[in-house]
């Protein structure tokens, strides 16, 4: 007598496909964090009251916030490029790399550079927001600075996702190069 066989199941995806899907998930998450951070920061305006005068402030009025916006734009550009490359790889299902080992080297260095840029952008925004909020306390700019904190926090989360991707690319590089 033979034992009944289990119904046939689809084979699990290859390990390289699982890592690409994980990378895609983290890149989409990074994109979402950066996009929301960008929207919050570009639409952030406030009014500071000094005596009888009112001054309208925007994020572009402060150099640290400008740097943060540039870091977000750079991060978004890189993330969109990497999402496109990852989708191309997944659709072709062609092993561990799309265009030779150069793609892994690009991932390795790109993830490192972009994660540092995002980290410094978040740090600049946190530092500027803390300093400005302290200096301008009681002048009516709390809502403006709280949005600055929110935007910097989302940028920091984008950095964390990119840093995790940087670790993944560090592990993938010695295997393929």
Curated annotation (Swiss-Prot):
Bilayer topology: Multi-pass membrane protein
GO cellular component labels: plasma membrane
The keyword Signal is assigned to this record: no
Subcellular location: Cell membrane
UniProt keyword list: Cell membrane, Membrane, Transmembrane, Transmembrane helix
Extracellular membrane side: 42-66, 129-153
Keyword ATP-binding among UniProt keywords: no
Primary location class: membrane
Ranges annotated as spanning the membrane: 21-41, 67-87, 108-128, 154-174
A Pfam family recorded for this sequence: CASP_dom
Organism domain of life: Eukaryota
Cytoplasmic side: 1-20, 88-107, 175-177
Family the entry assigns: Belongs to the Casparian strip membrane proteins (CASP) family.
Subunit structure: Homodimer and heterodimers.
Name the record gives this protein: CASP-like protein 4D1
Organism expressing this protein natively: Populus trichocarpa (Western balsam poplar)
């Amino acid at each position: 007598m033979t034992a009944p066989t289990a119904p046939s199941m689809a084979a699990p995806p290859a390990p390289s496909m699982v890592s690409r899907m994980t990378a895609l998930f983290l890149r989409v998450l990074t994109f979402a964090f950066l996009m929301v951070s960008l929207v919050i920061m570009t639409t952030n305006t406030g009014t500071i009251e000094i005596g009888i005068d009112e001054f309208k402030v925007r994020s572009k009025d402060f150099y640290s916030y400008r740097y943060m916006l540039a870091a977000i734009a750079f991060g978004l550009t890189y993330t969109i490029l990497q999402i496109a490359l990852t989708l191309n790889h997944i659709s072709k299902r062609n092993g561990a790399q799309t265009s030779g080992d150069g793609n892994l080297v690009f991932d390795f260095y790109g993830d490192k550079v972009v994660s540092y840029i995002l980290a410094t952008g978040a740090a600049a925004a946190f530092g500027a927001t803390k300093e400005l909020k302290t200096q301008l306390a009681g002048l009516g700019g709390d809502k403006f600075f709280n949005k600055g904190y929110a935007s910097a926090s989302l940028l920091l989360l984008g950095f964390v996702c990119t840093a995790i991707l940087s670790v993944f690319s560090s592990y993938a590089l010695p295997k393929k190069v």
